[in-house]
Regions:
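Conserved RNAP core-binding helix
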Residues: 9, 25, 33, 43-60
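A short pre-motif secondary-structure segment
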Residues: 133-137
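Sigma70-family region 2
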Residues: 14-15, 38-41, 52-69, 88-90
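Internal acidic/polar
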Residues: 2-3, 84, 91-119, 143
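N-terminal module of bacterial RNA polymerase sigma factors
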Residues: 1-31, 38, 124, 145-146, ...
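Arg/Lys-rich amphipathic alpha helix in sigma70-family domain 2
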Residues: 62-66, 76-96, 164
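DNA-recognition helix of helix-turn-helix
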Residues: 79, 83, 139, 151-175
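Residue-level preference for hydrophobic side chains embedded in well-ordered alpha helices
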Residues: 24, 28, 32, 53, ...
């Protein structure tokens, strides 16, 4: 349920009030940016997805209807924008013949105790398929069946990619811990 202030801000944005729209961005921008960062490889890409998500949010705002949590609604919309961006990017790469480029590497600094920032970096470095499935399952709480439907893959593929993502993350964490010792 929305607080009265939240409802007033949303209603103001629905009326096209610039101040209300800015307040929505300021209030939900950081939370939605965190969602974008989990689905994107770079900060610049996450910022682009966030911008697209807010454009979509303001377009779809009349359909919100004040049913349920606005934060949850905005989060789901942002996840959908991030997935569509990923699928569009993957399609463009396949069409241009560069779909097998090596994944971004790098030598991140290792820490014995991983903080949120370090864990986010590890997740961002996962191959695209692993990263998307990991986020949808482990963070967003979707089932493998739902993930399969969203991404157009088999349920078994979703399970396999999640297992591989977890294994990769465990290996990266162990590697960082060995370096830190």
């Amino acid at each position: 349920m929305q607080s009265m202030q939240e409802r007033e801000i949303i209603e103001g944005a629905l009326r096209g009030e610039e101040r209300a729209s800015r307040l929505l961005f300021e209030r939900y921008g950081p939370m939605l940016m965190a969602v974008c960062q989990r689905y994107c490889r770079t900060q610049a890409e996450a910022e682009d997805v966030l911008q697209d998500a807010f454009i979509r949010l303001f377009e779809k705002l009349p359909k919100y209807g004040f049913q349920g949590s606005f934060a949850g609604w905005a989060r789901r919309l942002t996840v959908n924008v991030a997935l569509k961006t990923y699928q569009r990017k993957r399609y463009q790469m396949e069409q241009s013949g560069i779909d097998n480029l090596p994944e971004r590497g790098g030598s991140p600094t290792a820490y014995a105790d991983l903080g949120e920032k370090e864990l986010l970096e590890l997740v961002q470095n996962l191959p695209d398929g692993y990263r998307i499935v990991f986020n949808l399952y482990a963070i967003e709480g979707y089932s493998h069946k739902e993930i399969g439907e969203m991404l157009g893959i088999q349920e078994a593929s979703s399970r396999s990619q999640l297992l591989k993502a977890r294994k990769t993350l465990q290996q990266q964490i162990q590697h960082r811990q060995r370096i830190a010792i």
